[in-house]
Amino acid sequence: MDAPVPAAPAFGGSWAKLNPPLSPWILDVINSMGFKNMTPVQAGTIPRAVKNQDCVVEAVTGSGKTLAFTIPVLERLSRREEPYKKGEIAAIVVAPTRELATQIHAVFHHFLSSLIPPESEEETGDVEAHAPPFASSSRSPSPQTPDKPLFPLPMLVTSGTPTPYETFQSTHPSILIGTPGRLAAFLLNPRGLAIVRVSELDVLVLDEADRLLSSPDHRRDVERIMRHLPKQRRTHLFSATMTDAVEEMIGLGLRNPVRIVVNLKDKRKDGEEPKERRTPMALQNTYLVCRHAEKTLQLIRLLLCESTKHERSKFIVYFSTCAAVDYFYRILSRLPSLSKFHLTSFHGELPPKIRETALSTFTSHPSSHLSPAVLLCTDVAARGVDFLDIDVVIQYDAPTDPKTFSHRAGRTARAGRRGKAVVLLGKGREEDYVGTFQSANAELMKRKRQKAQRSILDFLNIRKIPLTKQPYINAYLEEVDTPQALDPEATTLLHSIRQIILTDRELSDKAAKSFVSAFRAYSKHEASFIFRTLDFDFNSQAISFGLLRLPAMPEIKDWKKKKEAERQRLEKIKSEGGEVEEKEIIEWEDAGVNWDTFAYASRQREAARLATLAQRADNQSSNDAARAEARAKRKIKAEMREAWSEQKERKVRKEERKEKKDAKKKYEWELEQANGEGDRQSDLANIAKAQAERKKRREREEESWDEEIGKEYKSLKREIKEEKSVKESSKGGAGGGGIGGGMFDDLE
């Protein structure tokens, strides 16, 4: 590989200074978009990409990478002497997500649609007006001039593209943009092999290459596409971060590539070494430390503080899982304190059409500080999707993959705008995520480094992502130090969320699901030496999620055992006069809920739940009867295994107990009569008579009971003997060696 290209200046210069110069029609479109000057990544990439060079481009998010590959593709297409024939492909752009592919398609479409003459636009206006933003459109043939050639519009190949082969045959696009799986299926399907010709392909672009190659499925599809394409092509890789997988792909799929790295450096005083960074210079990157129980409270206060005090109007909030996004969207949208906010849910498990609608609703919302817009999402919106007007990014959960941190934060402070990013971190060990103790006691820092094998501190500083501390926000939206005890408002918020959940059992199900999924994501964090499951406080997290009760998880059961063992250990140390470091204990109490009557708001789901309860009750009664019969069988089997002498002794002991009981009652009665008055002899006769009657009555009851029980006993005993004989016969049949094994069965 060639030596890295020197970093471009802060401003890449005028578009007119490019060498070789761009076509006039491309410059016209750029000027109409309002871009007066190039960014450094554009100035470094476009001249080399227009020529016959493969490019590997690493630049911070929001630096203009999309135009850096769009313009060279169009310029090479415009300079080609022989136009492409129908069915031939000039360029393919691969993006990891549908949203990013749609955005890239819109940029290509904007350039190429500018070549359609006004009269042609009027003829096809009705078609274009009703066409979806991802669909390619055909156009009427019009005369072209050297200044304004005519090219077919690009085609988007994603999960939302209807009838792709019909669209391809009707529009004959020269440029395909799509996701890896859909593109691979489109190109390598027998029908695609027949109608899509790639022998003349000129350029392949891999946008967000690190994400494309980090996913096994994406990587497999990308490799299939690359094997299908001609080797004599230009290949460009673009990303904000470079990984080992990207480096491997550079060696396999590129020819003599040039590496273009655009760095940002903080300004320093004279004599100080400037520090590199991987986030935009206009970004205020911060972190806020709180207890896990206070995270939702701090999220709400951040939204209120930034919108009211700083007049921010557009926010993105990142969660680690789709279940958490779905749950918090339903809860936060019903909190009175956030009634003025317009919330949108966006994650990968939504159907493509709903995702598209959600994204469109958020971007088009006329937000202001009086009516802010908030997008609750997962990392599906962390890369490539270009939000030009995001004011604040809040990371409720630190990303599982630390490389995603810069991509999340980079959704704001784009195209020269200022922006703010905040990540919420748990109090304690999670503070090491940003090197909180770097300026603390040097000796303490040294011991911590040795204990954690010199790897836990300054995690993001090592990754060239500088952060500053965001103070805790109190109930008056004032910035203060993190409170020593749990914020009382956290408990108040817990009760408010519980009141919302109690309106629909489905919310309780979603709360439990999101809680479990959040812990699973926490346990899979790549920085597991910082985000340790051993330090995870389930009680604290449950308060933040507003749960009615802790879910049945084996991890919680083990955690409670360890917690109790630790408590007993500390109490023992205290009783022996030792000193114990007091640790904060956050208590948890389940909500008082009658789970049998707690209903779903949906009539269908509630009817299904009640039917399940009834079925469970029937099964319970039948199970109780089966268990009683099993107990009786076990008792009979035990008696059958007893010796005859033991059975006789047991009966004798039973009779002795009865006689002792009668003698005791007689003695008690005689004692009462000795203290009273009356005819002694008459009373004794009455006693003997009553005693004889009781004995006869008991004998009759025992006879009837013995008769009933005896029948059941004999029936069970007969059943046990039959089971035993069946087992013995099956054993004999399996053995096949002795007389009982059926050796002479055929001699009759």
UniProtKB/Swiss-Prot annotation:
PROSITE patterns from the UniProt entry? DEAD_ATP_HELICASE, HELICASE_ATP_BIND_1, HELICASE_CTER, Q_MOTIF
Q: Where is composition skewed (Basic and acidic residues) in this entry?
A: 626-669, 708-730
**GO BP field:** assembly of large subunit precursor of preribosome; maturation of LSU-rRNA
User: What spans are recorded as compositionally biased (Pro residues)?
Assistant: 143-152
**Gene Ontology molecular function: any one:** ATP binding
Q: Name the EC number(s).
A: 3.6.4.13
One Pfam family of this chain: CTE_SPB4
Can you say where in the cell this protein is located? Answer: Nucleus, Nucleolus
Positions of the Helicase ATP-binding domain: 46-260
Q: Point to the regions of Gly residues compositional bias.
A: 732-748
Q: Where is this region: Disordered?
A: 119-156, 614-748
Segments carrying motif DEAD box:
207-210
Q: Helicase C-terminal domain: which residues?
A: 295-460
The keyword Nucleotide-binding belongs to this UniProt entry's keyword annotation: yes
What are the UniProt keywords, alphabetically?
A: ATP-binding, Coiled coil, Helicase, Hydrolase, Nucleotide-binding, Nucleus, Ribosome biogenesis, RNA-binding, rRNA processing
Compositionally biased residues, Low complexity: 132-142
Show the Gene3D superfamilies listed in the entry. P-loop containing nucleotide triphosphate hydrolases
Residue ranges for motif Q motif?
A: 15-43
Q: Per UniProt, where does ATP bind?
A: 59-66
Per its record, the protein catalyses: ATP + H2O = ADP + phosphate + H(+)
Cellular component terms (Gene Ontology)? 90S preribosome; nucleolus; nucleoplasm; preribosome, large subunit precursor
Q: Which family does it belong to?
A: Belongs to the DEAD box helicase family. DDX55/SPB4 subfamily.
The free-text domain note is: The Q motif is unique to and characteristic of the DEAD box family of RNA helicases and controls ATP binding and hydrolysis.
Q: How does it assemble?
A: Component of pre-60S ribosomal complexes.
Describe the task this protein carries out. Answer: ATP-binding RNA helicase involved in the biogenesis of 60S ribosomal subunits. Binds 90S pre-ribosomal particles and dissociates from pre-60S ribosomal particles after processing of 27SB pre-rRNA. Required for the normal formation of 18S rRNA through the processing of pre-rRNAs at sites A0, A1 and A2, and the normal formation of 25S and 5.8S rRNAs through the processing of pre-rRNAs at sites C1 and C2.
The name on file for this protein is ATP-dependent rRNA helicase SPB4
Species of origin: Cryptococcus neoformans var. neoformans serotype D (strain B-3501A)
- Lineage of the organism: Eukaryota, Fungi, Dikarya, Basidiomycota, Agaricomycotina
